[in-house]
């Protein structure tokens, strides 16, 4: 039984999604909804986000809707206090949603060195029992480093949303 699940995955631009009305988002959110319901029915009581646009933002929207039906908490743990400060207004509005959850913190005041990202990843993994990732090793991004750390942690449960699964949901 997982109680705290880290949620992360591709950013919108990594998927070639640049419009909020892109029909692929509906399919992705349908998959997230199914998976989140399964996690909740199996005892999840926290979903932890990193504050990234794309998959995390869509998952956050789903999680906020599900809070009307299920009793669970949502947290955003940013890498830096100034996360998103250089974003455009539309993206800052999305960032604001990440700050309107049950728990919000950051691990560092600001960027000082690349080692902070490794420390941040360790912190996230050590404070969650599992992860839900939209990631495929054939379409690598920086998430591969986080995934490698997860795979090294004993009894860390990793669930994936894959492109194949999205195709199955699309065909339903």
Swiss-Prot record:
This is UPF0398 protein SAG0300. It comes from the Bacteria. PANTHER family: UPF0398 PROTEIN SPR0331, UPF0398 PROTEIN YPSA. Belongs to the UPF0398 family. It holds the Pfam family YpsA. Coiled coil: none annotated.
């Amino acid at each position: 039984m997982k109680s705290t699940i880290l949620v992360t995955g591709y950013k919108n631009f990594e998927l070639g999604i640049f419009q909020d009305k892109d029909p692929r988002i509906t399919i992705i959110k349908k998959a997230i909804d199914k998976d989140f319901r399964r996690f909740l029915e199996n005892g999840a009581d926290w979903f932890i986000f990193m504050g990234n646009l794309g998959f995390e933002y869509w998952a956050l929207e789903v999680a906020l809707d599900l809070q009307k039906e299920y009793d669970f908490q949502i947290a955003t743990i940013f890498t830096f206090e100034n996360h998103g400060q250089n974003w455009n207004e539309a993206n800052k509005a999305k960032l604001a949603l990440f700050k309107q959850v049950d728990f919000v913190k950051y691990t560092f005041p600001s960027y000082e060195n690349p080692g902070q990202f490794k420390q941040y990843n360790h912190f996230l993994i050590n404070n969650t029992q599992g992860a839900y990732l939209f990631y495929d090793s054939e379409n690598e991004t920086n998430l591969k480093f986080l995934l490698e750390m997860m795979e090294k942690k004993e009894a860390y449960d990793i669930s994936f949303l894959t492109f194949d699964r999205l195709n199955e949901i699309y065909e339903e």
